[in-house]
Curated annotation (Swiss-Prot):
Pfam families recorded: PP-binding (PF00550)
PROSITE patterns reported for this sequence: CARRIER, PHOSPHOPANTETHEINE
Function: Carrier of the growing fatty acid chain in fatty acid biosynthesis.
Modification note: 4'-phosphopantetheine is transferred from CoA to a specific serine of apo-ACP by AcpS. This modification is essential for activity because fatty acids are bound in thioester linkage to the sulfhydryl of the prosthetic group.
Family: Belongs to the acyl carrier protein (ACP) family.
GO biological process: lipid A biosynthetic process
Protein name: Acyl carrier protein
The keyword Lipid metabolism is assigned to this record: yes
Gene name of the encoded protein: acpP
GO MF annotation terms: acyl binding; acyl carrier activity
Record's subcellular location: Cytoplasm
Major localization class: cytoplasm
Sequence ranges assigned to domain Carrier in this UniProt record: 2-77
Species per Swiss-Prot/TrEMBL record: Xanthomonas oryzae pv. oryzae (strain PXO99A)
């Protein structure tokens, strides 16, 4: 079983079609990885599916970087 960080990064690579080395914890989905609003919605949906959780819209709007996604999952998902 891979770590939450590895799983989140893998989803970002798959959803945004970026290279793995571009996906650093400080990377912003929009500014650094070129995501648009639809990409970010699809990314949140993929995170929900992978981690079997529901991310409310008001929380999803706050997840704008790889680290924020990792932190959200760590604090809301039972490992």
């Amino acid at each position: 079983m891979s770590t939450i960080e590895e799983r989140v990064k893998k989803i970002v690579v798959e959803q945004l079609g970026v290279k793995e080395e571009e996906v650093t914890t400080s990377a912003s989905f929009v500014d650094d990885l070129g995501a648009d609003s639809l990409d970010t919605v699809e990314l949140v949906m993929a995170l929900e599916e992978e981690f079997e959780c529901e991310i409310p819209d008001e929380e999803a709007e706050k997840i704008t970087s790889v680290q924020q996604a990792i932190d959200y999952v760590k604090s809301h998902v039972k490992s």
